[in-house]
């Protein structure tokens, strides 16, 4: 007569179920962590659920560093710290740790220890298809959550297509651009030259009232004359300072105008696109796929005097004569002789314009 089958499970991932177990997740985790095994435990997830009669039970997922052979069906027994009671689990090898992990998440009452190990089988096994993984990623609500889901459930795509995934998820989960609220109302600037006021009235307007080809403006003046604060008080805008970042994270195609502040004209990419208020152009100033710019809005260029700042001096260079002839047809140039505000406004309490829905870059 053949001897009875001996208990033995040889697996890297174990799925345990403790029926009618009154232990808390923390009590169970503490005991499981102390179990001595020849291979390290890398990840433990404990889930607490209630039966229909209200009695609790626990599910446990354990991921080992390598295969662990268990020959003792009492090895994973837990004890109550409060009374004389033992809790014996149903023990299974988990073919797809990701499917088990997802199953345990359905009620949300889980406790994790360690770092979850990606299981290649999870992308092909069970009912988890690639479409399911991507649908879950899109519905996750954030780029970080979506990437984590794809890392677990579509590891091949995560490794081979990470660049595309990263770029596409940036577009899908583009956060709203932080609104800029000007600390000063435009009326706070009581020394604005008439030509600046006239330019703003004609060109800084909503899309419905905007000229087909608005005119840009270059404002040159010393530091602390109020150039930047005045420009940013005019309405919804894109603010680009020091360098250009036209990614959807910071650049809005719904802005009324651009402000380019303290960018050396020698290194300004898309000079004509900005100054000429050109429409429907592409930029790849940052690494990655080109960004489509709607355009058609004027730009305020702010600069200080000097060879590395002044747009006038840049355009007066002999090699830029053709560009100068083009620029004077597409922008006006204003040099400030003093601040845009009188002394009485210096140090005054700023007047906030709560309706000035501007964007920042």
Curated annotation (Swiss-Prot):
Residues 156-176 are annotated as: Oligomerization. Keywords: ATP-binding, Covalent protein-DNA linkage, DNA replication, DNA-binding, Endonuclease, Helicase, Host nucleus, Host-virus interaction, Hydrolase, Metal-binding, Multifunctional enzyme, Nuclease, Nucleotide-binding, Nucleotidyltransferase, Transferase. InterPro entries: CRESS_DNA_REP, Gemini_AL1_CLV, Gemini_AL1_REP, Gemini_AL1_REP_central. Residues 143-153 are annotated as: Binding to RBR1. Its cofactor is Mg(2+); Mn(2+). The keyword Mitochondrion does not apply. A motif (RCR-3) lies at residues 103-106. The keyword Ion transport does not apply. GO terms for cellular component: host cell nucleus. There are 3 rolling circle replication (RCR) motifs. RCR-2 is probably involved in metal coordination. RCR-3 is required for phosphodiester bond cleavage for initiation of RCR. Belongs to the geminiviridae Rep protein family. This is Replication-associated protein. It comes from Tomato yellow leaf curl China virus.
């Amino acid at each position: 007569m053949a001897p009875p089958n001996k208990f033995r499970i040889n697996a890297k991932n174990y799925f345990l179920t403790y029926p009618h177990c009154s232990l808390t997740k923390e009590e169970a985790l503490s005991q499981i962590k102390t179990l001595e095994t020849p291979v390290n435990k890398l990840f433990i997830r404990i889930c607490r659920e209630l039966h229909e009669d209200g009695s609790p039970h626990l599910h446990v997922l354990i991921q080992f560093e390598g295969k662990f052979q268990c020959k003792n069906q009492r090895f994973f027994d837990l004890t109550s710290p409060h009374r004389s009671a033992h809790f014996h689990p149903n023990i299974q090898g988990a073919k797809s740790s990701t499917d088990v992990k997802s199953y345990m998440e359905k009620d949300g009452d889980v406790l994790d220890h360690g770092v979850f190990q990606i299981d290649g089988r999870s992308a092909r096994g069970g009912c988890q298809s690639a479409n399911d993984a991507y649908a879950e990623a899109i519905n996750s609500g954030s780029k970080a959550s979506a990437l984590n889901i794809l890392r677990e459930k579509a590891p091949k795509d995560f490794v081979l297509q990470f660049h595309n995934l990263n770029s596409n998820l940036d577009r899908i989960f583009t956060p709203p651009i932080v609104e800029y609220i000007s600390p000063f109302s435009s009326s706070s600037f009581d020394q604005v030259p008439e030509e600046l006021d006239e330019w703003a009235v004609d060109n800084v307007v909503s899309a419905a009232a905007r000229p087909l080809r608005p005119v840009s403006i270059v404002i040159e003046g010393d530091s602390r004359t109020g150039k930047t604060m005045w420009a940013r008080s005019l309405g919804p805008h894109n603010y680009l300072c020091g360098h250009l970042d036209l990614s959807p994270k910071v650049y809005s195609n719904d802005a009324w105008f651009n402000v380019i502040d303290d960018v050396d004209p020698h290194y300004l990419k898309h000079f004509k696109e900005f100054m000429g208020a050109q429409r429907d152009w592409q930029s790849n100033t940052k690494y990655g796929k080109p960004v489509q710019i709607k355009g058609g809005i004027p730009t305020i260029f702010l600069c200080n005097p000097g060879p590395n700042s002044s747009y006038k001096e840049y355009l007066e260079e002999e090699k830029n004569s053709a560009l100068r002839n083009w620029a004077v047809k597409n922008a006006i140039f204003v040099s400030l002789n003093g601040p845009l505000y009188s002394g009485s406004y210096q140090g005054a309490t700023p007047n906030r314009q709560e309706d000035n829905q501007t964007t920042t870059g």
